[in-house]
């Protein structure tokens, strides 16, 4: 993929992160949004849902609203505002205020982008016609994430998704991910009764079942035989 295409894909995915935030804020108006970047595999957005709890069972309704909103988004409108004006707009969101304080200086102008009725603090990098290209996306999972990646901060809810320019690209990505899950050693170990994990001994320390211990011993013997043949 060319550098230009990479940039376009980043813009598409970041734009879809905006769309995700818009849908979440409409469904959960008490939630507080934080950041939503594009990443190598798609995008994510972190939220503080307060007393509300969401899981992957909530993703279909969020995605459904995203598709509905996307049809109404004709573009991303850039608004250049003073630091004070942006602080006033996001005064009820301590996460945005923290970001504003970090990236603002005396007399500096910040940018807020708007699509439809949704506005978000953002430096830019979006698609030009969201209602035409924000079509081929999928919300994938929900996870916990500390604000700013610091375990001393509050645990937020991170929603992951991915987006492409065509249905074929999206289908191919989802197929590859599904096949990878089938071959996940943690999944296979559990299903084949080879080993398990326990938080009591550490997440990276497998506990072998008798069957798993036998397989490991046979593999070790096989490797030793190969090494002896090469000596």
Residue ranges and their predicted role:
Residues 1-11, 23, 28, 32-38, ...:
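Auxiliary tRNA-acceptor-end handling modules of aminoacyl-tRNA synthetases
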């Amino acid at each position: 993929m060319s550098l230009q295409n990479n940039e376009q894909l980043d813009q598409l995915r970041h734009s879809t992160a905006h769309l995700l935030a818009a849908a979440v804020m409409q469904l959960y108006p008490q939630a507080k949004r934080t950041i939503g970047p594009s990443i190598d595999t798609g995008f994510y957005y972190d939220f503080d849902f307060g007393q509300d709890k969401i899981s992957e069972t909530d993703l279909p309704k969020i995605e459904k609203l995203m598709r509905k909103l996307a049809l109404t988004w004709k573009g991303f409108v850039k608004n250049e505002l003073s630091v004070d004006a942006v602080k006033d707009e996001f005064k009820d969101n301590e996460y945005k205020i923290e970001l504003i304080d970090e990236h603002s200086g005396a007399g500096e102008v910040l940018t807020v982008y708007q699509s439809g009725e949704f506005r978000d603090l953002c430096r830019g990098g979006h698609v030009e016609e969201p209602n035409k290209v924000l079509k081929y996306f999928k919300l994938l999972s929900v996870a916990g994430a500390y604000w700013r990646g610091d375990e001393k901060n509050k645990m937020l809810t991170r929603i992951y998704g991915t987006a492409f320019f065509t249905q074929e690209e999206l289908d191919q990505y989802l197929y590859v991910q599904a096949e990878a899950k089938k071959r996940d050693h943690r999944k296979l170990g559990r299903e084949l009764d080879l080993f398990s994990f326990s938080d009591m001994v550490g997440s990276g320390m497998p506990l072998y079942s008798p069957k798993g211990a036998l397989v490991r011993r046979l593999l070790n013997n096989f490797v030793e035989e190969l090494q002896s043949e090469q000596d």
